[in-house]
């Protein structure tokens, strides 16, 4: 395959000497070697393959990571050094579009006309440029707004094992927050199902977040590196999405929402790459650079004087083990953690948020107000007492409890059920209309519960309702 003469004149040309899955060795014999992280390009059957330099291994050979499939690549194929890192288009011209890891459109809407490009590898903003303001981001989801309030301009993690509702919860937050949001939104799909990305795109078109008739009026950009793609794409696509979010932030046009689903797949891709590069694995088979990989991504997700990035990230927990090194590496970087529990999901309580394991840095009376703080801590206290009594109940039964303990158990069970909520994105499955509950209604409802105002209502009146008024109406039909 002959490359265009103009590329040969301005770029170094090498030759492929080895291809092992997504790792490609390229020889630049007698020439200066490309820098680490430089992008190399090779054209096979009119398809461009993008490589990223990750190692210099001696004998004028660089080891590279492929961003797309290496099918058809052969020894001796010519490769050009672009002389720069992978760059992706940024700015308003990519609104309403779906991009891959190298910024190419994958939505069949034609090429992107863009003059502004930005490299995907960057340093975090300097300390003096970072913003530390703290205010609550209202999601309309009772259990989150009450017990683990999200920080506007902060980093939020949704932790959970397989099938407990991470993606549904992140989709509901997109529905409640992004649709009513004036700023821009970036959704980054990292190693997840292609079908989910397609469903999200259609939903955004249907709700006019993406305006196909006038793309510049759209409010979102989608970036996908799905589970069928090489580990290079899955390891770098989170950086591509973050680069686009940073560009919107630095345009000084308000806050930016950055959704990432799923951070664990980013870690998993890093482990695959580490093995292919011959590194010795660390605990549980993860790459030895796990903390560095996570840190280099998370430290860039920050708010500055120009604008704020609010990041909401789904994080898969292998085998429901929160002590696994991958989720542990994420905990330290987050401002709020929402833990989804399989035991709670088994009780039919959705969203299956564990109110005692989840936390937020702004669950503080000085930030959220004394009333909100008092109600939240009292709810946690009642739920903790109920949890400690469950062994007694299992062995001796409820009748052996004191009257005060029986009252706490009754209120705790009602609180548990009132923490449930029908979701807009799950209407087709539940047959129930979704509910958005304001923070004021949430605090008012739980305050009444802990004060005993609704002790006479049956438990099921509180299940899958929005506000407390809806629970009162439901009790009349039971």
Curated annotation (Swiss-Prot):
* CDD domains documented for this protein: ATP-synt_F1_beta_C (cd18110), ATP-synt_F1_beta_N (cd18115), F1-ATPase_beta_CD (cd01133)
> Known catalysed reaction(s)?
ATP + H2O + 4 H(+)(in) = ADP + phosphate + 5 H(+)(out)
InterPro entries attached to this UniProt entry: AAA+_ATPase, ATP-synt_VA_C, ATP_synth_F1_bsu, ATPase_a/bsu_AS, ATPase_alpha/beta_chains, ATPase_F1/V1/A1_a/bsu_N, ATPase_F1/V1/A1_a/bsu_N_sf, ATPase_F1/V1/A1_a/bsu_nucl-bd
Keywords of this entry: ATP synthesis, ATP-binding, Cell inner membrane, Cell membrane, CF(1), Hydrogen ion transport, Ion transport, Membrane, Nucleotide-binding, Translocase, Transport
Which PROSITE patterns would you find in this protein's record? ATPASE_ALPHA_BETA
State if Lipoprotein is listed as a keyword. Answer: no
- Classify the protein's membrane topology as the record does: Peripheral membrane protein
State the EC number(s): 7.1.2.2
Give its localization: Cell inner membrane
| Quaternary context | F-type ATPases have 2 components, CF(1) - the catalytic core - and CF(0) - the membrane proton channel. CF(1) has five subunits: alpha(3), beta(3), gamma(1), delta(1), epsilon(1). CF(0) has three main subunits: a(1), b(2) and c(9-12). The alpha and beta chains form an alternating ring which encloses part of the gamma chain. CF(1) is attached to CF(0) by a central stalk formed by the gamma and epsilon chains, while a peripheral stalk is formed by the delta and b chains.
Give the function comment from the record: Produces ATP from ADP in the presence of a proton gradient across the membrane. The catalytic sites are hosted primarily by the beta subunits.
Q: Which family does it belong to?
A: Belongs to the ATPase alpha/beta chains family.
Enumerate the PANTHER family for this protein.
Answer: ATP SYNTHASE, ATP SYNTHASE SUBUNIT BETA, MITOCHONDRIAL
Q: List the protein's name.
A: ATP synthase subunit beta
Source taxonomy lineage? Answer: Bacteria, Pseudomonadati, Pseudomonadota, Alphaproteobacteria, Rickettsiales
The gene name reads atpD
């Amino acid at each position: 395959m002959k490359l265009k003469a103009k590329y040969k004149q301005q770029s170094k040309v090498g030759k492929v000497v080895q291809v092992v899955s997504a790792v490609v060795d390229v020889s630049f014999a007698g020439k200066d070697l490309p820098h680490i992280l430089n992008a190399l390009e090779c054209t096979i059957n009119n398809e461009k393959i993008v490589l990223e330099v990750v190692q210099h291994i001696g004998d004028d050979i660089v080891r590279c990571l492929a961003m797309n499939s290496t099918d058809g690549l052969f020894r001796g194929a010519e490769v050009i050094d672009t002389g720069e890192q992978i760059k992706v288009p940024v700015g308003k011209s990519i609104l309403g579009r779906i991009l891959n890891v190298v910024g190419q459109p994958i939505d069949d809407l034609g090429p992107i006309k863009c003059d502004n490009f930005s490299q995907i590898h960057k340093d975090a903003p300097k300390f003096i440029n970072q913003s530390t303001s703290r205010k609550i981001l209202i999601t309309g989801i009772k259990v989150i707004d009450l017990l683990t309030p999200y920080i506007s301009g902060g980093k939020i993690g949704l932790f959970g094992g397989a099938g407990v509702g991470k993606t549904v919860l992140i989709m509901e937050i997109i529905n409640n927050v992004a649709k009513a949001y004036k700023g821009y939104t970036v959704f980054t799909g990292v190693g997840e199902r292609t079908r989910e990305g397609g469903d999200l795109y259609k939903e955004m078109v249907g709700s006019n977040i993406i305006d196909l008739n006038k793309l510049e009026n759209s409010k979102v950009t989608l970036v996908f590196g799905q589970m069928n793609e090489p580990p290079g794409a899955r390891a770098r696509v989170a950086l591509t999405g973050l680069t686009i979010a940073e560009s919107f932030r630095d345009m000084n046009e308000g806050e930016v929402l950055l959704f990432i689903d799923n951070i664990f797949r980013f870690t998993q891709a890093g482990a695959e790459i580490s093995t292919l590069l011959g590194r010795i694995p660390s605990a549980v088979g993860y790459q030895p650079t796990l903390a560095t990989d996570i840190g280099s991504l998370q430290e860039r997700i920050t708010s500055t004087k120009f604008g704020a990035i609010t990041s909401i990230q789904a994080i898969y927990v292998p085998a429901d083990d929160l002590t696994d090194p991958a989720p542990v590496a994420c905990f330290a970087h987050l401002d709020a953690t929402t833990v989804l529990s399989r035991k709670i999901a088994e009780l039919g309580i959705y969203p299956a948020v564990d109110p005692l394991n989840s936390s937020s840095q702004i669950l503080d009376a000085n930030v959220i107000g004394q009333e909100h703080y008092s109600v939240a801590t009292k709810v946690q206290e009642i739920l903790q007492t109920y949890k400690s009594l469950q062994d007694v109940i299992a062995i001796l039964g409820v009748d052996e409890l004191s009257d005060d303990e029986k009252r706490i158990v009754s209120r705790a069970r009602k609180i548990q059920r009132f923490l449930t909520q029908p979701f807009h994105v799950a209407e087709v499955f539940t047959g129930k209309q979704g509910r958005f509950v304001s923070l004021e209604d949430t605090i008012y409802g739980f305050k009444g519960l802990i004060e005993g105002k609704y002790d006479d209502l049956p438990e099921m009146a509180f299940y899958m309702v929005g506000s407390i008024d809806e629970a009162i109406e439901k009790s009349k039909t039971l």
